Amino acid sequence: LFAYKNSILQAHQRNDIISKVTLLTSTFQYILQIGALWLFKSYYLYILVQLLTQAITNVLTAIIASKIYPDFVPSGKLDVKEVHMINQRIKDLFTSKVGAVIVNSADSIVISAFLGLTVLAVYQNYYFILTSVIGIVEVVFTACTAGIGNSLIVEDQKKNFADLKKFTCIISVIAGSCSSCLLNMYQPFIKVWLGENMMLDYAAVICFCVYYYVYEINRILNTYKDAGGIWHKDRFRPLVTALANLMMNLLLVRFWGVYGVILSTVLSMLLVGMPWIIKNIFSTLFARDESKQYVVLLLKYAGVSLLGCVLTFFLCSYISIDGFGGLATRLFVCMVVVPVLFYLFFRKTEEFIASTKLIIQVLKTIQRHGR
């Protein structure tokens, strides 16, 4: 219902409007959902409120988009071939979304079936924190997608590949810093939040950190896939990756429990999803011979991120402060050490210099608009 109007705002990089509308309707949704559970104790009402709120969000967004961009009015008829092309792209995009849903849902289903609801509840607490961090970084991807898509059309291949390396550098610093934070803050935070009886072993924390880093790097590639609109060429990859994840889930959960479930997702992305999408991107958007250079760059960034995690783990082991004071201290250490390491190793590279200039430019723009 009117969801297509979102694309107008996204194309003009006005996601701030969508965010404001979503904030308003989500607040309204949560209030009604609390009331549905508290007063009526009805899960059906809870779900109905969610559907109603989404419809309201779409309508409000459509009204605002129509007022800001009154020139964009649907009229006339499309050519039959163009309609067929659009329908084909929708089908290809659908398979991509279905694959992502299967990957995200399979882990919980397998844990529930093989390890029980108690283990699932503990796992979900850790996963909730992970998805919260992913959601914060997702703002960067959402804001950049339209600009990347425009650049892929108007700029040459050399410029776009330079932008890819610059974007990868920025996300790698963010992902490395966040992975370090998760490694050193997961257990102390769970202890403060839920208590020691709701904590998994530290091996699970390491698995979650690896999962997070691989997910964010994979997200870079998916952003370029979406911006370039190469869903048809990539249509089978999400489904095959999801199938591989499910098969490894069923196999590894019997031997390693929760660790096997998390690692199966990591392995399915590393061994199936990422090589496949890199091949698709570099055979469509960039030169094929540049893929090796890009993979080497990813490995270098991963190595420095790993070094940062090890170093911060060593430093944080000396922090004896408990509670929120200890969390704040660990956060400071992690957010300083990893970026400093990236600076020391990559400060003379073109992509790091370009990334630094871009960040300074963005900060100046924010400061100028804030006055």
Q: Positions of the model-derived regions?
A:
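Interfacial/gating helices of multi-pass transporter permease domains
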Residues: 43-48, 81-89, 111-131, 162, ...
